[in-house]
Swiss-Prot record:
Primary localization: cytoplasm
Organism: Psychromonas ingrahamii (strain DSM 17664 / CCUG 51855 / 37)
Protein name: Shikimate kinase
Cofactor: Mg(2+)
A Gene Ontology BP annotation from the UniProt entry: amino acid biosynthetic process
Amino acid sequence: MAEQRNIFLIGPMGAGKSTIGRHLAQMLHLDFLDSDAEIEKKTGADIAWVFDVEGEEGFRNREQSMIDELTQKHGIVLATGGGALIRPENRIHLSARGIVVYLKTSVNKQLARTLKDKRRPLLQTDDPRTVLEALAEKRNEFYDEVADYTMETDEQSAKVVASQIIALLDF
């Protein structure tokens, strides 16, 4: 039996990685994993708590270890955290071990999708728009560098984007 390919979803918070990833995995009969959810399972604490206690550096160390572990699996759809590509090691593992799809979205859509989400430590500020714009400035080049394919998610449902990814990848 041929080895199953992996699909790795990257992009900023609020791009729809987890939601689209679940649909994609279900449609392709693959396992869905979310690196943030896996970190929460392993630590027994939510991401906000890890950020509070260990700082962003501590969280990024955990994330790097988790992405290394998860990308070694076969036949998965993996949703990564928005900042995962900051680390060069993560970019290397994702590129080498699967097909990378960048889910691209606007800051306006990110704001609409994340406005009431208290589980996003980087957005717990008086000016989340400025934070999202700064993150985009810093991270978009990494998404572009690693992506095998780019999909716009602003004006489409998660199911439609998942179907488009399947058609694009010819699964």
